[in-house]
């Protein structure tokens, strides 16, 4: 649970095999002592260029449950009310995604003004994002969510000090987890970013407050690193039960008139023999600006636009130099239901297996020896061919959850490829082949609860269909020229229900 004692030399990469899906499918990967962890990234924004804004598109992977908007609310006017142009690219970053177990998360980051923005962005990618899977798992494993979250905060401070001392930023972070068949969301906020939740029934609650300390802010920086426990104590750590459909909105800044003071208190700090007293304020979104019907995300964008226009008009009338505002980035994440969670888990596993097959192919190519002349004698050529066929099938049907699982199940049960299967078991960090097979079966049984799947299957028994398809996939892998597997698999799509239920599935 104490990450900073066990995590060493974390490395972050995007899965280059899927760069053609870069706007819809980002995979984060990290090696923790040989354990490969993967997350699905559905939305990401690394700031915006001066004078530009960014509105993310919908992502089919999570059924449009995530969005990001980014712009700048910086205003600098001269005495005549004319804009003073000063080029500044924004230093905000938001990442929205799901762990390999389908648990939703959101990371909201605001880099310091004038900071090394790329250092901030890289640190989040390389060192924070890879921690999310274990954070969610530990929240499930251990009873004290507050201690788990505080451990994560210590980890981030430790990693920053060691690997990215030039990265200075404030941050809010949240992740969901399952315990006792219920969904929860836990996380924290250090500094002036915030996270609010709009419940299904319309209630808005603040999970992470915008926190001020004597008018300034704590942060992930050298100054705050000197007393991390005190920083944690006066900022936000939370844990709350959530339901599918609840909306999590993270933001880096809103105009002050949209906030209200939720709490103000005094803390003491000791500097040598001197005792300093500091005033801490927790600021929330003022719920009076929002209704209980429309999404909080869209309401916040509209209210901010209106208030910003009002502020600019007032500033122009003063006849004085005016400077105010900040970068403005906001993210929306809707808690997925169990069906979508299962489908996200399927997708993550499919990508993991595909990546494992790529690694296996690379390994077999190395085993072929100088100029590859020993490939025939070692069997590497045959192994590479079979692994490539499986990999191509997974890539082709990755958006069909049922077929994806059938392919994975066939791969694991293929008695003629024991070395490849064993390689994948180790690559995916499963203790045994049986446990990997059980994982696939568990996901398959849950996918069969999907009403669309029941309609597709019609009167046919699922076990018969699964066994028949597995057999034909394995037959294709070992004799690709003698079968047309795609004609069979293409029957099992939503737009060919009738053909699927009436077909004898003869290749």
UniProtKB/Swiss-Prot annotation:
GO terms for biological process: protein adenylylation; protein deadenylylation; regulation of GTPase activity. Keywords: Host cytoplasm, Hydrolase, Metal-binding, Virulence. Its EC number is 3.1.4.-. Signal peptide: none annotated. It catalyses: [Rab1 protein]-O(4)-(5'-adenylyl)-L-tyrosine + H2O = [Rab1 protein]-L-tyrosine + AMP + H(+). It is an enzyme of class 3 (hydrolase). Pfam families: SidD_C, SidD_cat. Its main location: host cell. InterPro entries: SidD_C (IPR048702), SidD_cat (IPR048704). Transmembrane segments: none annotated. A divalent metal cation binds at residues 92, 110, 192, 271, 326. It is found in: Host cytoplasm, Host perinuclear region. One of its GO terms (molecular function) is small GTPase binding. GO terms for cellular component: host cell perinuclear region of cytoplasm. Virulence effector that plays a role in hijacking the host vesicular trafficking by recruiting the small guanosine triphosphatase (GTPase) Rab1 to the cytosolic face of the Legionella-containing vacuole (LCVs). Acts as an adenosine monophosphate-protein hydrolase (de-AMPylase) by mediating the hydrolysis of adenosine 5'-monophosphate (AMP) to 'Tyr-77' of host RAB1B, thereby releasing RAB1B from bacterial phagosomes and rendering RAB1B accessible for inactivation by LepB. De-AMPylation of RAB1B cannot take place when LidA is bound to RAB1B. NCBIfam families: deAMP_SidD. This is Adenosine monophosphate-protein hydrolase SidD. The gene is sidD.
């Amino acid at each position: 649970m104490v990450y900073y004692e066990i995590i060493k030399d974390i490395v972050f990469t995007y899965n280059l095999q899927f760069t053609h899906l870069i706007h819809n499918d980002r995979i984060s990967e990290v090696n923790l002592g040989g354990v490969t962890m993967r997350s699905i990234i559905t939305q990401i924004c690394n700031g915006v260029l001066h004078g530009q804004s960014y509105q993310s598109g919908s992502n089919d992977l999570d059924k449009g449950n995530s969005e990001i908007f980014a712009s700048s609310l910086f205003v600098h006017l001269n005495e005549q009310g004319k804009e003073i142009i000063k080029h500044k690219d924004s230093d905000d970053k938001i990442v929205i995604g799901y762990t390999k177990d389908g648990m939703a998360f959101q990371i909201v980051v605001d880099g310091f003004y004038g900071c090394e923005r790329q250092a901030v962005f890289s640190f989040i990618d390389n060192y924070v994002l890879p921690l999310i899977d274990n954070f969610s798992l530990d929240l499930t494993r251990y009873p004290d969510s507050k201690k788990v979250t505080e451990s994560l905060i210590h980890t981030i401070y430790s990693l920053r000090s060691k690997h990215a001392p030039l990265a200075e930023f404030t941050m809010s972070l949240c992740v969901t987890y399952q315990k006792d068949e219920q969904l929860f969301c836990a996380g924290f906020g250090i500094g002036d970013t915030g996270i609010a939740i709009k419940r299904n029934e319309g209630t808005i609650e603040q999970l992470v407050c915008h926190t001020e300390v004597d008018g300034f802010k704590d942060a992930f920086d050298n100054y705050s690193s000197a007393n991390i426990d005190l920083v944690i104590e006066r900022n936000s750590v939370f844990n709350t039960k959530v339901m599918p459909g609840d909306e999590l909105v993270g933001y880096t800044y809103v105009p002050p008139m949209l906030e209200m003071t939720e709490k103000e208190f005094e803390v003491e700090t000791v500097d040598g023999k001197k005792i300093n007293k500091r005033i801490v304020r927790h600021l929330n979104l003022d719920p009076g600006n929002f209704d209980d019907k429309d999404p909080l995300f869209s309401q916040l964008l509209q209210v901010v636009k209106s208030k910003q226009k009002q502020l600019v008009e007032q500033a122009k009338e003063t006849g004085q130099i005016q400077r105010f505002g900040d970068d403005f980035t906001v993210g929306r994440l809707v808690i997925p239901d169990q069906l979508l969670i299962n489908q996200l888990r399927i997708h993550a596993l499919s990508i993991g297996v595909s990546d494992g097959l790529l690694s296996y192919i690379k390994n077999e190519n190395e085993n072929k020896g100088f100029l590859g002349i020993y490939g025939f004698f070692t069997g590497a050529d045959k192994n590479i061919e079979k692994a490539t066929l499986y990999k191509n099938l997974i890539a082709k049907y990755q958006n069909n959850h049922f077929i994806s699982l059938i392919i994975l199940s066939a791969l694991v049960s293929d008695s003629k490829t024991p070395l490849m299967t064993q390689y994948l078991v180790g690559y995916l960090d499963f203790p045994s082949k049986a446990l990997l097979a059980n994982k696939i079966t568990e996901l398959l049984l849950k996918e069969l609860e999907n009403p669309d799947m029941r309609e597709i299957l019609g009167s046919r028994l699922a076990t018969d269909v699964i066994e028949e398809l597995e057999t034909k996939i394995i037959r294709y892998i070992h004799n690709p020229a003698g079968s047309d597997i795609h004609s069979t698999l293409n029957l099992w799509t939503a737009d060919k229900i009738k053909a699927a239920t009436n077909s004898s599935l003869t290749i």
